[in-house]
Amino acid sequence: MDIAKGSVVIAKAGRDKGKAFAVTEVLDSRTVLICDGKSRPIERPKRKNVIHLQATGTTVDCITTNRQLRIFLKNFS
């Protein structure tokens, strides 16, 4: 499954293992920026290797605030 901007992903490795995130930007073929609206707000995304992410097949459409993102991702955690 391909990871693109707006994809909902689950972290497979690291201290955030098992948490749901939304991809905010694809930097290159190996790294993306992810956020969850709480520990990683939209203003301060985390850089993550795509090898450590599992795609869920769901995409986020036009979420602009951290609160909206937290509510949307609550179903995945």
Task: State where each predicted segment sits.
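Ferredoxin-like alpha/beta domains used as RNA- or RNAP-binding modules
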Residues: 1-5, 12-13, 22-77
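Short N-terminal binding/cap micro-motifs at the start of the first secondary-structure element
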Residues: 17-19
